[in-house]
Amino acid sequence: MIAAKNAGYEGIGLRAETYVDALNEGLFDKDILAILDKHGMKVTEVEYIVQWAEEHRSYEQKYKEQICFHMCELFDVKQINCGLMENYSVEYTAQKLRELCQRAGKYIIGVEPMPYSGIPDMKKGWAVVKAADCENAKLIMDTWHWVRANQPVDLSVIEDIPADKIVSIQINDVWERPYATTILRDESMHDRLAPGTGIGCTAAFVKMVKEKGIKPNAIGVEVISDAILAKGLEYAANHTYENTKKVLEEAWPEVLQ
């Protein structure tokens, strides 16, 4: 977090597992809040609820869900990011999303389409969110997932989706050649690129978001990369921040003000 702050970042996304690890190390909520305050940082996103469409959810998943709700209350975060690896029909998935949204109450459930998941693209993502018909059911747009789902960076992909149904965006970049389909998730979890340093899709992606009139709760930089991280936290934070800033200065300078 200190490296992120020093690089220029204003906030962080926090996973439920990371929060629980902090508690397990002996920290209390007040301690975590004090650390954030000391470094002038805030939590802007909470994640990651999965397996929410299971007919019989495990207690682990139920507990994790409640932890996410608590984290939103603690850190004053409006949204929880969610994914779904299992593949079900639109109708069934929408029903389970509706139930999750009801449990979430005032918090927004941000559904993230991922090409190797049960919600692989924006088309199915919107079909599910639309059918769920909940005010707090929305979508997340991620550059890497977008490109690897073979979606053109074009407004036509989201022409039927209201701008206010996109809750946040996550930006990064991709290699020209994807991993094989069977191991595509490995690329997602280990080999992403900083914005503007791959095939160069990030600026166009951000411009598309701007032109659509989307007002994201958060613009996250999600660069999961073993190679970048191997160079150290300070390098990773500076490298991703500097390249993100370049992209935003080109595509959407207003958000930097």
Residue map of PLM features:
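Short, conserved active-site loops that position catalytic residues or coordinate cofactors/metal ions
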Residues: A7-E17, E45-V50
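Glycine-rich, proline-tolerant flexible connector loops at the mouths of alpha/beta enzymes
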Residues: G13-D37, N87
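Active-site-proximal loop/turn and secondary-structure-junction residues that shape catalytic pockets
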Residues: A16-T18, I49-W52, Q79, L84-Y88, ...
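Short catalytic/ligand-binding loop motif for oxyanion handling, primarily in non-cytosolic enzymes
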Residues: A22, S89, G118, P178, ...
